[in-house]
Amino acid sequence: MTTCPVCGAANEELAVVCTSCKGFMRAKVDTLDLFHTMWGLFEAPTATFRRIALSRIKNYTIPLSCCLGIAIAFMLFWNANLGVAIPQLTTLIGLGILTGPFLGLAVVTLLALWAKWLLRRMDRKIAFRNAFAVLAYAAVPVVISLVIVFPLEIAVFGIYFFDKNPPPIVLNPVAFIILVGIDAIAAGWSVVLSGIGMRALAGLSRLRSGILALSFAAGIGGLFLIPLR
């Protein structure tokens, strides 16, 4: 809950106007600047997520979700060694680019619905579009990794990044450990950001927001149990 600085009344976490005295408690936000918001996620994530939730227009949430889906698709391909079944690199990359956006939108939608349902059980009401936006922007580290690290992985390993004969770690162990390590750090930071975002959105404790973030990670991790070949 948020306390009104004028009359002291308790209001919802992200309320702009006090329900008691009708005074403004915080400035309205119309739109989001992508690069300013991305930087804010690293510099001041809690304040940035509040700004995202308060924004009237949730800019870039759909493109970010689609890019997240593409990154997940390529991670699934790598985990399943799909290069064995599809030896053409261009075909494999095209498949990820085509299917990834649908996967990303589905994942973010389901996680937002899960967050809304679970928080309702905790007597915390959040809007679906706010949960969707927070989760989409929490994926920024993964999206950055997709844009910067994934092309390097393809440049170094080619189709063998998705193969096991030989596995990429055998071809260039140092490059593999560094690049995949950066991917892992990006994924972990996105999980942390999702917890910070939910805390900013619903006023959760660190323990509850951490548990919720781990449930998001577990949900996405469950995708890796699906056999792709």
Segment roles from a protein language model:
Residues 69-86, 158, 222-227:
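Juxtamembrane "helix exit" motif at the C-terminal ends of alpha-helical transmembrane segments
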Residues 57, 85, 89-101, 105, ...:
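Hydrophobic, aromatic-rich alpha-helical transmembrane segments
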Residues 34-52, 101, 114, 118, ...:
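Hydrophobic alpha-helical segments of integral membrane proteins
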Residues 41-42, 59, 98, 137, ...:
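Hydrophobic alpha-helical transmembrane segments of integral membrane proteins
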Residues 15, 19-34, 92-116:
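Alpha-helical transmembrane segments and their immediate interhelical/interface regions
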